[in-house]
């Protein structure tokens, strides 16, 4: 599978621009602010139906315009596939496959497998547990729609339970009947989510470790571990034991919405003890492991986006990454970089067909 062509209309800084791509390596080079990352984000839209960078979709519309359109032509298993994503101010975003509108964006998830590696991935280290849970969920959801639907339902029931706890506090009442129903629903949904996350990480962590050791040339050891309250106790028991605490807080304090991943180097938090190069290597290994996991599970090579990833990496680590993507295990690769000569030197090392777009 590969992206043959993309057309952008009023998307971020592009008014009306098209790119025709090589099936292996495509590079966007130029100064900061010319739109390199915007092209990668447009490609990301075609896979996920949303931006990787902007939570507000309307911010992706070009200034002084009222809509954007991203139109992509793919070759997938020797069939031509057209994916179109568009948004008009004040209206719902539209996602189409071959002219047919998706009723639910979740039905499209996984059809165009894709992995992005970007400087914003540093949020996985810097930010709170929600960011790391989203990473787990995004990987599993690409491959398991049932998991995604369970996750959506869990969040809905969780919101209802939290609203009930607030209602109890405001009205100074308490009754267990409705709460017990929500507890049972959360338990069933939460246990399923926990089991799938645990199974995913059992498979994922060895792949991650292998990539990190390769990138770092085994210079240091790292640890990636799953942390969940459900490791020691079922969710129903936890909910029942913490009811007084939840009533006081007016929200649900236990459940899979509190799960986390710990990132360590030599058994110390990488956030505090890892250098910039080590942190970047950790995140790249994490995303390459995502690529490998999705490829194995889906049977397709995901499109891989490298957004300005070579800064703060020494030459040895860059060469290791290039060597890894320079084999048949990887498919189409998109690279953005501010240094055109560095980019050309890197892609020449691969001996693959490539195209460089100077923006």
Curated annotation (Swiss-Prot):
<dbReference type="InterPro" id="IPR003395">
    <property type="entry name" value="RecF/RecN/SMC_N"/>
</dbReference>
<comment type="function">
    <text>The RecF protein is involved in DNA metabolism; it is required for DNA replication and normal SOS inducibility. RecF binds preferentially to single-stranded, linear DNA. It also seems to bind ATP.</text>
</comment>
<comment type="similarity">
    <text>Belongs to the RecF family.</text>
</comment>
<keyword id="KW-0235">DNA replication</keyword>
<dbReference type="GO" id="GO:0009432">
    <property type="term" value="P:SOS response"/>
</dbReference>
<keyword id="KW-0227">DNA damage</keyword>
<keyword id="KW-0238">DNA-binding</keyword>
<dbReference type="InterPro" id="IPR027417">
    <property type="entry name" value="P-loop_NTPase"/>
</dbReference>
<dbReference type="InterPro" id="IPR003593">
    <property type="entry name" value="AAA+_ATPase"/>
</dbReference>
<keyword id="KW-0547">Nucleotide-binding</keyword>
<dbReference type="GO" id="GO:0016887">
    <property type="term" value="F:ATP hydrolysis activity"/>
</dbReference>
<dbReference type="InterPro" id="IPR042174">
    <property type="entry name" value="RecF_2"/>
</dbReference>
<dbReference type="GO" id="GO:0003697">
    <property type="term" value="F:single-stranded DNA binding"/>
</dbReference>
<dbReference type="GO" id="GO:0006260">
    <property type="term" value="P:DNA replication"/>
</dbReference>
<keyword id="KW-0234">DNA repair</keyword>
<dbReference type="GO" id="GO:0000731">
    <property type="term" value="P:DNA synthesis involved in DNA repair"/>
</dbReference>
<keyword id="KW-0963">Cytoplasm</keyword>
<keyword id="KW-0067">ATP-binding</keyword>
<feature type="binding site">
    <location>
        <begin position="30"/>
        <end position="37"/>
    </location>
    <ligand>
        <name>ATP</name>
    </ligand>
</feature>
<protein>
    <recommendedName>
        <fullName>DNA replication and repair protein RecF</fullName>
    </recommendedName>
</protein>
<dbReference type="InterPro" id="IPR001238">
    <property type="entry name" value="DNA-binding_RecF"/>
</dbReference>
<dbReference type="InterPro" id="IPR018078">
    <property type="entry name" value="DNA-binding_RecF_CS"/>
</dbReference>
<dbReference type="GO" id="GO:0005524">
    <property type="term" value="F:ATP binding"/>
</dbReference>
<dbReference type="GO" id="GO:0005737">
    <property type="term" value="C:cytoplasm"/>
</dbReference>
<keyword id="KW-0742">SOS response</keyword>
<dbReference type="Pfam" id="PF02463">
    <property type="entry name" value="SMC_N"/>
</dbReference>
<dbReference type="GO" id="GO:0006302">
    <property type="term" value="P:double-strand break repair"/>
</dbReference>
């Amino acid at each position: 599978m590969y992206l043959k062509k993309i057309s952008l209309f009023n998307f971020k800084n592009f008014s009306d621009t098209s790119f025709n791509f090589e099936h292996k390596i495509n590079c966007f080079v130029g100064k900061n602010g010319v739109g390199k990352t915007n092209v990668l984000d447009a490609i990301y839209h075609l896979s996920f139906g949303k931006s990787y960078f902007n939570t507000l979709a309307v911010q992706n519309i070009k200034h002084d315009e009222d809509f954007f359109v991203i139109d992509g032509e793919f070759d997938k298993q020797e069939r031509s596939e057209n994916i179109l994503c568009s948004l008009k101010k004040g209206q719902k975003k539209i996602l189409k496959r071959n002219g047919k509108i998706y009723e639910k964006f979740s039905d499209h998830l996984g059809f165009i497998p894709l992995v992005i590696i970007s400087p914003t991935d540093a949020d996985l280290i810097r930010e709170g547990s929600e960011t790391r849970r989203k990473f787990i969920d995004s990987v599993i959801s690409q491959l398991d729609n049932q998991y995604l639907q369970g996750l959506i339902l869990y969040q809905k029931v969780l919101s209802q339970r939290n609203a009930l706890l607030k209602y109890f506090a405001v009205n100074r009442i308490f009754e267990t009947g409705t709460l017990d129903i929500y507890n049972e629903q959360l338990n069933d949904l939460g246990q399923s989510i926990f089991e799938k996350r645990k199974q995913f990480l059992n498979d994922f962590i060895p792949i991650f470790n292998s990539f990190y050791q390769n990138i770092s040339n085994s210079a240091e050891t790292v640890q990636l571990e799953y942390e969940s309250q459900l490791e020691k106790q079922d969710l129903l028991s936890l909910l029942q034991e913490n009811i007084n605490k939840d009533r006081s807080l007016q929200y649900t304090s236990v459940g899979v919405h509190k799960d986390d991943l710990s990132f360590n180097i030599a058994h110390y938090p990488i956030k505090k003890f890892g250098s910039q190069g080590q942190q970047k290597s950790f995140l790249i290994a994490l995303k390459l492991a995502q690529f490998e996991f999705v490829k194995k599970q889906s049977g397709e090579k995901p499109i891989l986006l490298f957004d300005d990833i070579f800064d703060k990496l020494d030459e040895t680590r860059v060469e290791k990454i290039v060597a890894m993507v320079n084999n048949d295990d990887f498919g189409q690769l998109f690279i953005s970089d501010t240094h055109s000569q560095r980019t050309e030197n890197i892609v020449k090392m691969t001996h693959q067909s490539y195209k460089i777009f100077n923006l």
